[in-house]
Amino acid sequence: MNIFDHYRQRYEAAKDEEFTLQEFLAICKQDRSAYANAAERLLMAIGEPVMVDTALEPRLSRLFSNRVIGRYPAFEEFYGMEEAIEQIVSYLKHAAQGLEEKKQILYLLGPVGGGKSSLAERLKSLMQRVPIYVLSANGERSPVNDHPLCLFNPQEDAQILEKEYNVPRRYLGTIMSPWAAKRLHEFGGDISKFRVVKVWPSVLEQIAIAKTEPGDENNQDISALVGKVDIRKLENHAQNDPDAYGYSGALCRANQGIMEFVEMFKAPIKVLHPLLTATQEGNYNGTEGISALPFNGIILAHSNESEWVQFRNNKNNEAFLDRVYIVKVPYCLRISEEMKIYEKLLNHSELSHAPCAPGTLETLARFSILSRLKEPENSSIYSKMRVYDGESLKDTDPKAKSYQEYRDYAGVDEGMNGLSTRFAFKILSRVFNFDHVEVAANPVHLFYVLEQQIEREQFPQELAERYLEFLKGYLIPKYAEFIGKEIQTAYLESYSEYGQNIFDRYVTYADFWIQDQEYRDPDTGQLFDRESLNAELEKIEKPAGISNPKDFRNEIVNFVLRARANNNGRNPNWTSYEKLRTVIEKKMFSNTEELLPVISFNAKTSTDEQKKHDDFVDRMMEKGYTRKQVRLLCEWYLRVRKSS
């Protein structure tokens, strides 16, 4: 199918369909979406969640306490926002059941650049997936999306409708608009003359979806919400005639759908008054002497915390406060999820194929998240950041607390302050374009750009010092360690085999040492007594600064014996035990004198050295670095190493 046929097919599928009122009632009998409220239709569009048993994945089990959680495919690109999404779905479920939430404003509260607008856009987009049914008369569709059931009286007609068409009583009671009431009189009370149109909500055409923004204090009035008289029609109609009214307000257009109010609490208070009755009573007054207008939809508002605090502290606004269902949308606090946000943003730009050195996005994510975290008590903020990402630190940091302990101490406002994803992405843009020749990103340029930006932003001195401490006290040393390991692993071709040999040898020596037995090497025939074994073990332990060798050796041998039982008697992989892995890596790379000629970009004295250097560069490029980045990062690493 070519693009033109594909477009036409889509256009035809979205065309209006017209039915008689009798046909519509027959549809109600078979399809409950024909009379479902806005929250129910939005839930249909969101769909069922994919249930995830977090007990099966160690990282998730630490974050979600082994609970079974639901993940909604409709929100799969909203990373680290499970809690906010769950609250939104909870609001919709309760509203769909006709509970108090149906009468409340769904209010997304969060810091700038935290994803509130993106969530609102996704909800509006989902609203377009399920059609609505609207009254029509004389070929003209109701300007306020009157639902056909508004024609019926709950006291008089509910029993018949429930018995014959399976329409529950609670779906009756929405008032008729002045437009529908006028047509009813014109038809002499004959409701069969009405038609019903099946319409697809549309952001583009503002059908059942509308958006309003705060205007100037002096010139914005409630007509932005409720509409006003259309002076062009006064030539043919009286001022209080429903046909003289311009139903252009956001509440008029959003009936049966969703109305988004951007930065709601920046609007003058007089503009917000129609929302009180629209939410609680399902109707509101227009600006002229016409009868009340119906509203049976969702009001979605969002703003930053400062506006909300100011609004909440004003005693005159108490009527509103009780009608607001708050969903907090904080910044992402998990490194892995923050990285996915950057990847998503990059994929929607020209930089999607630009080289990005390993560690760049992770380093930026670490910096962003450190800025958002509250300082913990009796523990390191760096450990807290890692625990928030689902890491287990029981082997590396005995002071680290559990995820829940950190959350409880930080309180509900954690993640509502700090550097935004928007700020981080602007940093990333500058890093990619830092080099005038190569469009690529690497952590060394990232450090430079971040330091510059911290100075330019003119943060309060204490905050600027805190950010610089994150950079110089943690991120730069951490990255120096990472790139050192990258360089060293690229240098050692048989890295994995070499590491496994050291591991196996260490375990054997430790086992014989613990049992106080001599050991004869099967390959060389060399005999090791307990003292010789101890000397060999210390060669591996000393570079890592093991303070209590006896306990360490017992711990390792016990771990390996347990692992062998589940591994057909074979030793586990040398990387499987974090403590020993660190020890082996430090032993492997304690002597780097022979490493320097290979990784430096100086002129080589022999073809053998040149070949080793070229092989090293090729292996680094296989890891995801460009040739230029290999040189830059090696030179940076050697400088940092020398200065420390």
What are the functions of these language-model segments?
Residues S33-S644:
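Conserved ASCE/P-loop NTPase catalytic core
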